[in-house]
Amino acid sequence: LITGNHPRHLYLAGILSQFHDVVGWVIEDRGEFLRPESNYSEDALLNELCAIHFKARYLAEKRFFIDDSTINITSSNFYSNVSKNIIRCSKKDLNSLSISNFINGLYPDIAITYGIHILDNSILNLLPIEKYNIHGGISPWYRGSITHFWPSYMLEPQMTGLTMHRLTAVLDGGPILHQNTGILVRGDGLH
């Protein structure tokens, strides 16, 4: 399992561990909340909207995944079948020799990634044949990052969802296995 460290990523790890043995877990430190890597300085309003979105997303995740006592991801019981093989890394170290060595010692049957930066071929080649990515957007329309911001910005909230696809060297480009969109309810906001 290779995930980011945001509450939604930790939640997935906890849910998977309740049904499967997680033999190893690489956690990429994504910071408190993701800021777009592109510079939108030519559009001050877009910059402001992005800042509002990321703050609201962070608060919504905290409220749902941490403050809600029925789902609390900070409880050690939530990760019942996660082995002690856990390594944390930065974006810079995600494709490093230390991560390669860690993965080499695991021998997983399947690999799942969610919420991380791009893995290079040196890491992809170490993973088992059965490897999948959970992408926080509806591919191929919303690839890359901040994929829950853009559908609303483009007035397509029905395109907010997740895609599970085979993990390949092409960014969010492997064959799609499943997609799911959110249920729209009158009065809901983006968060």
Task: Annotate each language-model stretch with its function.
Residues 1-191:
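One-carbon transfer enzymes
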